[in-house]
Amino acid sequence: MATYTCITCRVAFRDAEMQRAHYKTDWHRYNLRRKVANMAPVTAEGFQERVRAQRAVAEEESKGTATYCTVCSKKFATFNAYENHLKSRRHVELEKKAVQAVSRQVEMMNEKNLEKGLGVDSVNKDAMNAAIQQAIKAQPSTSPKKAPFMPTDESRRVAGAVRRGTPERDPTEKPPRLQWFEQQAKKLAKQQWEESEEEGEEDDEDWEDIDSDDGLECENPGVEEEDAEDAEAEESPPLGAIPITDCLFCSHHSSSLVKNVAHMTKVHSFFIPDIEYLSDLKGLIKYLGEKVGVGKICLWCNEKGKSFYSTEAVQAHMNDKSHCKLFTDGDAALEFADFYDFRSSYPDYKEGQDPAEIEDLSSEKILECDDETMELILPSDLEYFD
């Protein structure tokens, strides 16, 4: 009959099932550690004696901590003496000082969190007090009988809330960056639809008479009021947008837009690319204020990198990473095309020329044909030879 053994514990089993069960016991794991340390294995009886001795020590330590004052670093023989000590004036004064010391540490943590963009207004006061009490109990002491502080799940959650300075965020909530990009996509689709509607109305003007126009105006008296309300809604800045007189990268406020741009250039090394062709400075800074304040988006990272959930956090990121600049490489420059006018860089541009005149050039001017030679003549008066 086959014999099943454990070389580490030096025991034998009558079947494989008992052997597999033995491999899962604490006794076998204990002997494995002793084997790694080049020590002889212990028997099952010896292991049980060690376990009982360890439990007795743990119980003794737990009794010691039950009558030990962590604030005053004193041990008491009985619970009555311990209870009387908790009511003494000296203990109350020391506990108050300990609370003040821990409170200062919490305030310092909150100041650091503010620098990182995490607020403290939403912290529950009860949660903060509970975390302070837990921190007082966890303070190190000189007593050899004091057992180490083991925080519970509740204390970890409370202390984490105090350190972060913000409540736990819903994991299903969309990041502000994604919400902002979706809003921009909707605005672009609406703008394209309105432009197509305007083009269709212009094409239909030749087929409509004055009477029909008057009839439409009478049938829809509230259209103009609705358009006015939509215009007012578009003019009002969205919630959280940074004003054009506030810095995009810190809390500095300027008295004018020009001074604000000068501050960002001097303090944060911010510069506007191709500024000689910039036609709408106010619109550009307003757009960037919405991008940073509403979308919580880094001007350099854009859709790449980590998501931010507060304006202070994305501002701290841009300052720390030197991202106080616009990303305009490749197709990314098209994002700011509405704020620029590059017509002055065209070789055939004439100062004061209406851009509509350039777009409305007739096809006869673009392509002409010589009646005698049947050659195409380009707008620059150059002949085309096949």
UniProtKB/Swiss-Prot annotation:
Cellular location(s): Cytoplasm; Nucleus
Broad class of where this protein is predominantly found: cytoplasm
Residues modified as N-acetylalanine: 2
Zinc finger (U1-type): 4-28, 67-91
Keywords noted in UniProt: Acetylation, Cytoplasm, Metal-binding, Nucleus, Phosphoprotein, Repeat, Ribosome biogenesis, Ubl conjugation, Zinc, Zinc-finger
GO cellular component labels: cytoplasm; nucleus; preribosome, large subunit precursor
Region listing for Disordered, in residue ranges: 135-237
Biased composition (Acidic residues): 194-235
Post-translational changes noted in the entry: Phosphorylated by MELK. The phosphorylation may redirect the protein to the nucleus.
InterPro entries: Matrin/U1-like-C_Znf_C2H2, ZN622/Rei1/Reh1_Znf-C2H2, Znf622/Rei1/Reh1, Znf_C2H2_jaz, Znf_C2H2_sf, Znf_C2H2_type
Record field: compositional bias (Basic and acidic residues): 165-176
Any one GO molecular function term: zinc ion binding
The keyword Zinc is assigned to this record: yes
Physiological role: Pre-60S-associated cytoplasmic factor involved in the cytoplasmic maturation of the 60S subunit.
SUBUNIT field: Homo- and heterodimer. Associates with pre-60S ribosomal particles. Interacts with MELK and MYBL2. Interacts with DNAJC21.
Name of the protein this chain belongs to: Cytoplasmic 60S subunit biogenesis factor ZNF622
Organism encoding this protein: Rattus norvegicus
Classification of source organism: Eukaryota, Metazoa, Chordata, Craniata, Vertebrata
